[in-house]
Amino acid sequence: VLVVTVLSGLANQSLRRGLQAADAERTLQQRWGTRTIERVFLTEASRLFELREEAAKELKLQTPPPPVVRTRIDLGGVAFDVLLGDEDAKVSLNAMYHRVGPESTAKAIGQVAGRPVQQSTRFLPAIRPLRIARENLVLQPNNDEEDAEMIPDAFRSWGEVFDLATLEKSLGNQAALPAATKELTCWGSGQLNFDRASDEAILAVTSSVVQDGGGRRLLQRYRDNPTATLDILLQTEVTNPRNRDQLKELLSETSTNFSIWIDAQAKTGRSMRTFTAMKRDEEGVTQESRFSF
């Protein structure tokens, strides 16, 4: 009986060590795969979106494809769900917050992501809106001093925008955050890429400055004539100079910032979800923000 007890204890101990080793190996595979995919996709993000745009033009699509690319990759027995995003084709919450205020920012979230997502907002900004801090000074895009100053980030993580527990409960799944933020960003340049953004994102931004009807006319004019430049559209469709200047601050035709969600799922054990945003400053230096969930 003693021998059986000893052997049983040794077997259990060996099993535990084996499971721990398997867990460590699985975690290593998840981390290695995540970092590899992250590095490759973010490095080639600009080209990937350009190729997709070329394909959309060949197919003569009336509306641009969404500002995200989804794919699934299997590496070493681990499945990686990948969501690559163009951050400059999403509504910049930092730019909206500073230029049009928290109420309009919350409204824009509802317009783009839906009412349940808007109801999950819980703004915890690092600083006050720039306009309030400057006693409602109107920002002018041609002011040299203003151009030299980068808008500080009020929101540096999704936890400063949403009550994440409420958001997950409202949408009913653990992937609530990637789904809710596919057209929202805290890491873009602050200007929405008019060529790549969805109709909803464009209307959310433009209607914060001009009446909804004016934003729709601007969008329709662009859809009718997609070769028209943003400057020409604003010049012909927005008569108020101050509104036109504000829209120039909020809209652009380029993208330089990208992000990636990666959900690494092994056959056993818990999944590993990460979000990484790549942002370039005015000098072209790239900074990465990385979060694990």
What kind of region is each of these model predictions?
Residues 1-293:
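Compositionally biased linear targeting/interaction segments
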